[in-house]
């Protein structure tokens, strides 16, 4: 029931409906909510663009939930009957009553972290009491260690199902035994729960969080879930989503078109087909043996007991029969043969510059039909494959690790994608919302909207079959055919919106390009067309032109010098970023200086680069946030469509400027890009297509500007934020205004490098007092977040029941899991070291150790290297963190060092002295993934005292020597003090020089 008291503002959207909003809404929020309510009333769809910082998520939630509550008031009896129909959900409810339900809201976003933010926003509103759940995979929800330790999500699912069917999962059994009233008591706390809340509740009460969330979805009014759970027909089937009479919201929908196409596409290799055949043979052999054993035992027993044993065997293998397996195996054999024939046939044509061959999608259906597959039988065939996988996984001791059903899984997914994605126009014409699978597949529709691409590996003859869907509207039509009432697409950056709405193929009743909350948007946008050496056209051909590369560097330096705090610099691709940075590192920025452009940039700002590996991002983010709080600020070099361009919130000081170098066009030789352009060119040549059809060049440009607009969105995160946008490429000047978000268009001007720097400098000088205030607030905010983060880590550690800890690279040098080594205290006291609180992240570092070294030198202490910081004073013993070890006091006195006879500060070579001053945060920089794994494994073993220092020496040496010998010597800083001396001595004896 809704709470009686209210601190919300009542906003009347129309004479019949008021919305309870957490505060007095801005005009842009009123407009947004009015558009939502209008399309809900008219049973239409909407595309809603509203700038970041305008409360888009709040507006979506409040307006939609208010509309649904009004529907409940008009149909109270029907709704009450539905909610009290029990855990059986839709399957136990009469269809006539079901059609009278008020709509269920499915709120989809790209990632679980974005959904957690939606939960946070929902709990700020008057509607937090609405029955809500969040769906996710076992990877996020499961608390059973047997399942959690499995990395592959598909195997997790099969193992979980096996444990559940055998009643071997304690958490599921307790969940299954829980009464409806007791479950309601657990879950109805008056506000929405995110994944972390479900997991915590499940852990505390030994209840399965995964099945709790799924069961709650049967009667929930609001269901939060990732995009692909709605779009992907395989996921809809797996989670049994009932979309009839529902409202589907896609938040952050700017990537939805490509996601729809991707989820309607499929891929299969000849290797997977061959593996599927071997796995089916294995299942057949095991099944025959098991049936023979059961019959033999049954013959030896009495009739009654024998029947019982045979029944038990049948229960264990469920519906799996040898006859079905033989039929499936025969078809997979035929599939392998037909695919080989297809590659050599004239139906496939070469597609320069690609190495493979392509055709319309209809050819694939014809090939599958020759192998014995059709829409009538494919679902049963997929069920047999799924049962075979579960059976194979149940034989853990009898089956090799390589025979766990991967081949069968991939073949099943491929077939399901092909036969359950494409909707036939006649289905809508006859008014059937639930159409048989056979009626959903129309070869002509497939041919018009898909391309088949097959590539053969020259070395091993492996075939790769790729089935590309190039029409996002197919996925949207499928949703509508399943009875979806409304589809709402929302984002901060849908522009260019006309092309977006055309490609989605929905019945739009509202297309909104919303203004910003502020009439005067506090953003300065500059298109830099020229540098000192000429035009800045960042085409692929121009990328290696030295005048262009140095021109960009000069322009970048000019604006970096006048922009305070943090700058986000986006490149078109990783390859472009790597090439430019490499040239900047070797090119002098001035004829009168020996400094390179890169060295000059590093003097201007602390410069950090977005890593390719996701697990390294936290450490890089820390270095950036630390730099932002410094006097000169920091610059983060990143890539459009990368990890930094969306999904991470850079507020205020962290994004005073967004600079985009070049235009991020999709890779011209990418398979999907080449075939998509071919598909669009084919459409342009047809007479039966609409006049608004999109050319391949228009699509190519639209894809680039959508990535640009998403990166631009980083600059303004709320109404009090401000910053500049610098588009560093001549070609932006010729772009149509509608390619940019509406709120940005009036802020755009053109200039050369000097003009841009002058305008930018003036912009920030006018806001000098705001910048000074933000510096103080930023430091306070970071300190608060850091404190909160540490408390969470300590609580999680003390609640943990596991004996095994996963050690990350970030933890390796941190003191949280290390035992303090007791040593004598010297009389001299170095300066008090204050732990950094500039970020919530933890990074391996020995910068404070270097401060102590300086203190030692000033006090004439003759010993090797620095007295270690707390992170180096501890023995590297891994412990399960608990209350007694979660907080360690920093000592101001350095421990007394053991006397070293062979090495002193005076006898250590200068090159070694310089090397051991390298911060430990530099050790992982530019290291390959394989070397990082080796480095991590070695350090874990050393910290656990399972290997000695000399083994560390041998393992580290090939990682760093000969190219990075200075870093190899710097690795001594991660060892215990007594081992550090031995390590350095051995390095000297081995004649390792920097």
UniProtKB/Swiss-Prot annotation:
Molecular-function annotations in GO: 4 iron, 4 sulfur cluster binding; ATP binding; ATP hydrolysis activity; DNA binding; DNA helicase activity; DNA polymerase binding; metal ion binding
Keyword Nucleotide-binding found: yes
The protein's Enzyme Commission number: 5.6.2.-
Keyword field: 4Fe-4S, ATP-binding, DNA damage, DNA repair, DNA-binding, Helicase, Hydrolase, Iron, Iron-sulfur, Isomerase, Metal-binding, Nucleotide-binding, Nucleus
Residue window of motif DEAH box: 251-254
Disruption phenotype: Viable, although the brood size is reduced and the life cycle is retarded (at 20 degrees Celsius, worms take 24 hours longer to reach the gravid adult stage). The smaller brood size may result from replicative stress, which is often associated with a persistence of unrepaired DNA damage during development. Mutants show defective crossover interference with all double-strand breaks becoming crossovers and a compromised homeostasis after ionizing radiation.
Catalysed reactions listed for this entry: ATP + H2O = ADP + phosphate + H(+)
Protein's name according to its UniProt entry: Regulator of telomere elongation helicase 1 homolog
Organism: Caenorhabditis elegans
